[in-house]
Amino acid sequence: MSRISFDQLLEAGAHFGHLKRKWNPAMAPYIFMERNDIHIIDLHKTVAKVDEAAEVIKGMAKNGKKILFVATKKQAKEPIAELAKSVGMPYVVERWPGGMLTNFPTIRKAVKKMTQIDKMTADGTFDNLSKREKLQITRQRAKLEKTLGSIADMNRLPSALFVVDVMKEHIAVREANRLGIPVFAMVDTNSDPSLIDYVIPSNDDALKAIELIVGTMCQAINEGLMERKAEKPEEEETEEAAPRRERRARSGARRSRQNENEATAEAATEVAEAPEAEEAE
C-alpha cells in the first residue's frame, strides 16, 4: 500500500506545474497534460516516487544517518522547521550559507564560536565584559543562531539533503552534487531533475503539497528511528550474552584439560605399577 494517495496529492494541489513557457523539457516524463497553458503533473508517478524516496530515507534513519532539510522560501520555512525538529533532523530555512557543505570545517568553527559564547554566559565571563563588548557578542550570537542554530548538532556532513524548490536552492544542490551527497527533492516542471537523485515531481509552491510530502518523509524517518531503537535492546542482549558464552567456553576448556591431566596421571600410575606386578610373580 502506498504511503500517500492520488486523492491526497490532488487535494493538496500537487499536480499544478508552471506555465508552459517556463517548463524544463527534462521534466517531460512527469507531465500528464497541459491545461490553460499550465502543465499538469502526473500524480500517479508522484505517488510512486514518494514511496521510493520514503523507503530510502527510512533506511538511512534506521542506520543513524542525518538528512538535512533545505527550504528557504517563505511559505515553506515554518512547516519544514517544525517537521524536521519533530524527528530530530537538521534543517536550513534561512539563507543558505555558501560553502556550508563544501567548506564544512569553517561552518563547524562558527558553530563552536556560538557554543563558546554560551559557555561565557554560563560561567560568568560575559558579565565581566564592557557594555560595548556585550552588545557585539550578543549580536554575533543572534546572527549565528539565526543561520546555524538549526544545524548546531550536525557534527559531520549529512548523509542526504531533502530540498523544496530545486531552483531556489540551486547552491545547496550544487554543493551536494560536488560531494556526492544524495539529493531528494520536490521538483516542479520548471526545474532540472538531472541534478536530483530522488525526484518527487510536484508543485513546490503550494503549502499543502509541501506539508503533505515532507510530512510523509518525516513519518518514514520516524519509522526508521523506531526500528533502530527496537533493535538496540537485542544488540545489547547479544553483547551481554557473548561474555557468558566465552566464560562457558573457558570453563569447558578447563574441565577438558583437567580430565586430560587426570587420565594422564592414571596412565602413568599403571605404567609404574606394571613391573612390580611382574616381579611379584
Swiss-Prot record:
Keywords: Ribonucleoprotein, Ribosomal protein. One of its GO terms (cellular component) is cytosolic small ribosomal subunit. It comes from the Bacteria. GO terms for biological process: translation. Residues 262-272 have a biased composition (Low complexity). Residues 245-256 have a biased composition (Basic residues). Residues 225-281 are annotated as: Disordered. It holds the Pfam family Ribosomal_S2. GO terms for molecular function: structural constituent of ribosome. Belongs to the universal ribosomal protein uS2 family. HAMAP family: Ribosomal_uS2_B. This is Small ribosomal subunit protein uS2. It comes from Porphyromonas gingivalis (strain ATCC BAA-308 / W83). The lineage of its organism: Bacteria, Pseudomonadati, Bacteroidota, Bacteroidia, Bacteroidales. The gene is rpsB.
